[in-house]
């Protein structure tokens, strides 16, 4: 075993995964996590891999790119996906987890590894020696200043938004119905149907509601995958009906008709006592937020256990700064992982940590770093963030559009996606023992 130690800064999804991958390869890890010594504006616990936006790790099917990336990670012994599978709650064709159980399990697996030493302290300087920086979208000001100095790049600021969570017992079950869109998978969502009149009343209240003021010096950039519902609404009345409130595939079993609009609620914990309001990330003040949400049929008396909040998110200009191995171009033993690289989403963040961790371990063992080909989901993400246009670089979720095109064109979308998945999983088999 090598005596060299790898520093991993941040025990979120990416940092926890990186630490585990390094440790399982016989390399000592010092995992630095500033919580609970210093908290962030969005975290509430001292657990590793705390989920702060939604409890869903999104699609679990192989006809979706994020489902493919999960399967690749399973094959490569991802601690994040293993914990998620063990803590899953009903969510139709998606993989959703009991967030508290999930964080506890990741913490247990990583903390108890004999090659991992956890250091509960804030890092304010970039360490010398092999290091993985996975401090996430809420990197502390001192370390942010050091990273800005290191990269010579300006950070880009934008806001991720968290959806409200309500108590199931406070939902009027006579007004909602259990159904997944197009009856895919098990019926996992509670649906709140709206007539056009009810939608109009809700819409007018939403666009008139008061939001929390943003700091003047921070430029507003919203990532489409986690955009506040009031920002979507400001783009026009139909944005919601064709977005998070789209009713297609959600016929009301009582009437046999498709409602004008539907608000979906998804189970948030294993016990099934909490539900989050899907797609309703918001920056509304809490008083107006409650008034608006109680205009949704079935939620007139809803007990809100967590109001929607927004927090800053930060990412570096990876095309200028990183290689597809997640190494910093100007320093071979410095790696970045997670959302600060411009991968967007829980699963994508963990996947970047997996690859950065593998390559950090390989580096200290004198082995060549691995570049996964872009026919794989993980390889396509690494390729995107390092090879795309640096001038217009924005965060990106996993999607088949990032994959190397298929040699043969396939017209039908499902068959095409299945072909992408088959090719990816066949290719990743060549890397499972690295």
From Swiss-Prot:
Molecular function GO terms recorded: flavin adenine dinucleotide binding; tRNA (uracil(54)-C5)-methyltransferase activity, 5,10-methylenetetrahydrofolate-dependent
Compartmental location: Cytoplasm
BP terms from Gene Ontology: tRNA methylation; tRNA wobble uridine modification
GO cellular component: cytosol
Listed PROSITE patterns: GIDA_2
Protein name: Methylenetetrahydrofolate--tRNA-(uracil-5-)-methyltransferase TrmFO
Reactions catalysed, as given in the entry: uridine(54) in tRNA + (6R)-5,10-methylene-5,6,7,8-tetrahydrofolate + NADH + H(+) = 5-methyluridine(54) in tRNA + (6S)-5,6,7,8-tetrahydrofolate + NAD(+); uridine(54) in tRNA + (6R)-5,10-methylene-5,6,7,8-tetrahydrofolate + NADPH + H(+) = 5-methyluridine(54) in tRNA + (6S)-5,6,7,8-tetrahydrofolate + NADP(+)
Cofactor: FAD
EC number(s) per entry: 2.1.1.74
Pfam families: GIDA
Gene that specifies this protein: trmFO
Top-level taxonomic group: Bacteria
Source organism of the structure: Bacillus mycoides (strain KBAB4) (Bacillus weihenstephanensis)
Binding site for FAD: 10-15
Cited HAMAP family: TrmFO
Record-linked SUPFAM superfamilies: FAD/NAD(P)-binding domain
Keywords: Cytoplasm, FAD, Flavoprotein, Methyltransferase, NAD, NADP, Transferase, tRNA processing
Described purpose of this protein according to its UniProt entry: Catalyzes the folate-dependent formation of 5-methyl-uridine at position 54 (M-5-U54) in all tRNAs.
Membership in a protein family: Belongs to the MnmG family. TrmFO subfamily.
